[in-house]
């Protein structure tokens, strides 16, 4: 990243898979040190830790280590719809006690959530969380945009999106359409038209090449709670 001419006044973020650091042969601490230098030597501002519920406790060490290096730290809890709300509240309370996580993200990993489950999830998090909340939606059932906008209505501050929904399997919330909706709701000063040429030209070609996006297979994977990697393997 240091070799790139990056725009200034932009916060740059990366996401790491907690499971890979926890399972590193040299230990979790060594894994963190191998990947990250001190913030003062890096263009990265934010590190987001993606984790499953079973690894939450082990993420505290990773989060504290990254904070000591000078990074802002977010947590991304995956497969949120498979966690009952009492367990979710307990997890959020634990993470709150760490005092080092700036934003608590939840991921609709199977793309099978709806506005009701989004609402229930946000309420469960808010009951134990004093800071910002984020959502990472998947578009298996075509609900990513609606779920993202609903999450904002329910009080979520951070919404993930990519151009043309670029992402694994069915993809994620489409940035160009999300910005149109947000601008229409007067939630900020955005200019979605500026993205249209990039989406229609460069990213359209990338989508044809890498073939991400909705299909009946990904829809059915959401219906039956099957991880999208199994569909990709098919």
Regions found by a protein language model. Give the residues of each.
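Catalytic cores and adjacent flexible loops of soluble metabolic enzymes
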Residues: 1-234
């Amino acid at each position: 990243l240091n070799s790139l001419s990056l725009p200034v006044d932009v916060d740059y973020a990366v996401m790491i898979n907690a499971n890979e650091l926890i399972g590193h042969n040299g230990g979790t601490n060594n894994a963190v040190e191998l990947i990250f230098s001190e913030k003062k030597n890096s263009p990265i501002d934010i590190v987001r830790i993606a984790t499953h519920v079973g690894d939450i406790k082990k993420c505290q060490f990773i989060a504290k280590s990254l904070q000591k290096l000078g990074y802002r730290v977010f947590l991304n809890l995956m497969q949120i719809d498979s966690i009952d709300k009492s367990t979710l509240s307990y997890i959020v309370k634990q993470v709150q006690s760490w005092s080092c996580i700036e934003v608590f993200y939840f991921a609709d990993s199977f793309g099978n959530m709806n506005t009701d489950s989004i609402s229930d999830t946000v309420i469960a998090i808010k009951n134990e969380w004093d800071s910002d909340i984020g959502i990472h939606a998947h578009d298996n059932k075509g609900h990513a945009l609606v779920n993202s906008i609903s999450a904002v209505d329910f009080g979520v501050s951070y919404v993930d999106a990519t151009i043309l929904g670029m992402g694994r399997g069915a993809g994620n919330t489409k940035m160009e359409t999300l910005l149109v909706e947000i601008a229409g709701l007067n939630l900020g000063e955005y200019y979605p038209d500026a993205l249209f040429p990039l989406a229609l030209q460069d990213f359209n070609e990338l989508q044809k090449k890498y073939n991400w996006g909705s299909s009946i297979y990904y829809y059915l994977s959401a219906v039956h709670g099957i991880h999208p990697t199994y569909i990709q393997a098919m």
